[in-house]
Amino acid sequence: SLYAPSALVLTIGQGDSASAGIQRAVTLSCMPTPSGTHPDARDACAQLRQADGKFDELTATKAGTYCTKEWNPVTVTATGVWEGQRVNYSHTFGNPCMAKAAKSTVFSF
């Protein structure tokens, strides 16, 4: 194959762990072309490539974002393969506002 495989299942759940009640899930494949059930696969793949697959960069909060301090956790996960490497990523945001304030749209679905 000319391309290293990149196929992920992305989830968003309510709660503070990866086993939280999953509310939404999509698939994202980036090679050879962006595809899957992600609503903006092309942009999500471009952001993943730009971050070199470092999901922590994608879940960082945009500068100048203001959210309440309420604890209403939202957990996002990415499981699968990115450029041939196994991925098992999980990140918990303090609340939905913080999740929406992430720098990327990879987990916007």
From Swiss-Prot:
GO cellular component: extracellular region
Family: Belongs to the protease inhibitor I16 (SSI) family.
HAMAP family linked: SSI
Pfam families in the record: SSI (PF00720)
Protein name: Protease inhibitor SIL-V2
Site (Reactive bond): 69-70
UniProt subcellular location: Secreted
A GO MF term: serine-type endopeptidase inhibitor activity
UniProt entry tagged with the keyword Secreted: yes
Disulphide-bridged cysteine pairs: 30-45, 67-97
Quaternary structure note: Homodimer.
Protein's organism: Streptomyces orinoci (Streptoverticillium orinoci)
Sorted UniProt keywords: Disulfide bond, Protease inhibitor, Secreted, Serine protease inhibitor
UniProt-listed Gene3D superfamilies: Subtilisin inhibitor-like (3.30.350.10)
